[in-house]
Amino acid sequence: MKTLDKEEFRIKLEEINKLVQKKDYKGAMGIVDSIDWRRVKNVRTLCVVGEIYAANKRYEDSKEIFLLAYHRAPIGKNILYRLIEVSLRMKDIQEAEEFYEEFLEIAPNDSTRYILNYKISKEKQVPLDQQIRILEEYKEKEFTERWSYELAKLYYQNGDTEKCLDLCNEMVLWFSEGKYVMKALDLKNRMGMLTGAEKEKYDKQFIPNLTTVEEAAELNTDKDSQEISEIEKA
């Protein structure tokens, strides 16, 4: 691993960023491995590298880079969040809990602490009642689609269909559309509690988006007009 001058490093960094934008994390990792990141001080760059390693399931390398970033960041709560997630991916619950304690010291009032606590508790396989209480506390602070659905799913798994149904209805009312609303409708469907309009919306996702005869004719007309225009220009 040779030492790069500033220009070589800049070029490689541009290549990495382009590959990340294309979500080609495997290709980006090929470049990342050729650089000694211990010499890099830019926290944002280090975080990108940490994410690349995590995307390639190289969690030990990801953790090492995130630790470098954490020690160079003035306030590192977001980096601690990722360190906790990476530690959990590595099944290192003890280390995740140590990072979580650091997170609480830095950001004791940040509502994200509930999500981190939930992720750790889930990995530890604590009883569902405890997991539910954590997400209920979070819901009192923040009402978000993803974690509301997660809570509804826990209610369902715990056999509390009434609370599951109430929360699913609340999600549909507040958010109306989106991935997690469809997941909430799926839970309602399993319980046989979809309304007529909800069933129509739920079933629609399984129907291919086919082009009608009229739309196809219109597309062909537009294409013919474009070809004629190009011929006239020539």
Model-predicted regions and their roles:
Residues 1-30, 75-85, 98-120, 177-234:
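Intrinsically disordered, low-complexity, charge-biased linker/tail regions
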Residues 21, 55, 89, 123-124, ...:
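Register position in tetratricopeptide repeats
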Residues 37-40, 73, 141, 174-181:
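Short solvent-exposed coil/turn linkers within tandem alpha-helical repeat scaffolds
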Residues 47-54, 67-68, 75-143:
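Alpha-helical adaptor scaffolds
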Residues 25, 59, 93, 127-128, ...:
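TPR-repeat structural position
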Residues 1-10, 34-41, 136-140:
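TPR-adjacent "capping" and linker segments in tetratricopeptide-repeat scaffold/adaptor proteins
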